[in-house]
């Protein structure tokens, strides 16, 4: 966890509480080149520092450079596509608005409970309505909704409008694996199955890594054509900002343009049976040169497999 990493990088601090004077004594035990120092501060102040530090790292834990779920993560994964960049900033914008509304309503509720309780206000006021208040609580929410709607529709339009495509990948969901086809490269196709615990290698991620990843070049506009061969699935990769249902007999599409090299993980996000939780998605983003080399290797492997099958017959 990032909190543990953070504390391990700091000078080790020995905490000694003086119960008699309610103070805290810190002794910094640093490396051989550092100087030790001792100082005392009120215990409550030090506890607040610890609480604030813990809250900070819990909130910002998921903002490290990772393309996968993390322990204690409570925000989005770092965005790696233009759509996800917009969604990420829009989410933060909504968070400010929502927080302000919650604080205002909670404060107003607290004020009313204290100011107009039976003790402070033994004779309650009796009135049917107040025109000014009714106008305020109608107009202000409308303004807030308009402020939210404008960027929301802009992002929806951006996501729905598919630009000029450089690469197309067909995605077919099955119980419980994915099948990928590259129609631009002689219909190169392969299955992608989660690596089981017994076959997991060092460095591979449990429940996320697969035997065959989708490989795409960076800074390339990729279109995904998504369907299913049995039941409804959902093709979702959070860090790329898309979640598209895979429906039998229907083709849905989405697009992405990944700006950072790396491996981005997703999962089937529609309950599809007993092994629904074991349908991970892994998209590896590489340079265009590495992508061409990967395509050549895959095609060569496919040709060898076909030759082997023909020879066996």
Swiss-Prot record:
Binding site for Cu cation: 233, 268, 272, 276
GO biological process terms on file: ATP synthesis coupled electron transport
GO molecular function, one term: cytochrome-c oxidase activity
Domain RPE1 insert per the UniProt entry, residue ranges: 5-51
Keyword Ion transport: no
Membrane topology: Multi-pass membrane protein
Gene Ontology cellular-component terms listed: plasma membrane
Chief location of this protein within or outside the cell: membrane
Record keywords, A-Z: Cell membrane, Copper, Electron transport, Heme, Iron, Membrane, Metal-binding, Respiratory chain, Translocase, Transmembrane, Transmembrane helix, Transport
CDD domains registered for this protein in UniProt: CcO_II_C (cd13912)
UniProt-listed InterPro entries: CcO_II, CcO_II-like_C, CcO_II_C, Copper_CuA, Cupredoxin, Cyt_c_oxidase_su2, Cyt_c_oxidase_su2_TM_dom, Cyt_c_oxidase_su2_TM_sf
Signal peptide bounds: none
EC number: 7.1.1.9
Reaction(s) catalysed (UniProt annotation): 4 Fe(II)-[cytochrome c] + O2 + 8 H(+)(in) = 4 Fe(III)-[cytochrome c] + 2 H2O + 4 H(+)(out)
Cofactor binding, per record: Binds a copper A center.
Family matches, as NCBIfam families: CoxB, RPE1
Similarity remark: Belongs to the cytochrome c oxidase subunit 2 family.
Record-linked PANTHER family: CYTOCHROME C OXIDASE SUBUNIT 2 (PTHR22888:SF9), CYTOCHROME C OXIDASE, SUBUNIT II (PTHR22888)
Protein name: Probable cytochrome c oxidase subunit 2
Organism of derivation: Rickettsia prowazekii (strain Madrid E)
């Amino acid at each position: 966890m990032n909190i543990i990493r953070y504390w391990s990088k700091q000078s080790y601090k020995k905490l000694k509480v003086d119960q008699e004077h309610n103070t805290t004594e810190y002794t910094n035990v640093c490396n051989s080149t550092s100087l030790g120092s001792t100082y005392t501060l009120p215990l409550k102040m030090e506890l607040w520092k610890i609480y604030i530090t813990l809250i900070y790292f819990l909130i910002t834990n998921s903002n490290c450079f990772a393309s996968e779920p993390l322990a204690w993560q409570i925000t989005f994964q770092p965005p790696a596509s233009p759509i996800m960049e917009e969604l990420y900033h829009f989410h933060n914008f909504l968070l400010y608005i929502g927080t302000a509304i919650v604080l205002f309503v909670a404060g107003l509720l607290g004020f009313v409970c204290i100011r107009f309780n039976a003790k402070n206000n033994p004779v309650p006021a009796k009135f049917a309505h107040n025109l000014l208040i009714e106008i305020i609580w109608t107009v202000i929410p409308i303004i807030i909704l308009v402020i939210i709607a404008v960027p929301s529709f802009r992002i929806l339009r951006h996501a729905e409008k598919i630009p000029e495509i450089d690469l197309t990948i067909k995605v077919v969901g099955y119980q419980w694996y994915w099948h990928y086809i590259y129609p631009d490269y002689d219909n190169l196709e392969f299955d992608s199955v989660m690596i089981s615990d017994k076959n997991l290698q060092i460095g591979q991620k449990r429940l996320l890594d697969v035997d065959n990843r989708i490989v795409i070049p960076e800074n390339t506009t990729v279109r995904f054509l998504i369907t299913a061969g049995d039941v409804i699935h959902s093709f979702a990769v959070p860090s790329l900002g898309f979640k598209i249902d895979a429906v039998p007999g229907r083709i849905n599409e989405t697009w992405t343009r990944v700006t950072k090299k790396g491996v981005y993980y997703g999962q089937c996000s529609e309950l599809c049976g007993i092994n629904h939780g074991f349908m991970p998605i892994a998209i590896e983003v590489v340079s265009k040169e590495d992508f061409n080399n990967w395509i050549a290797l895959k095609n060569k492997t496919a040709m060898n497999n076909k030759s082997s099958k023909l020879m066996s017959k």
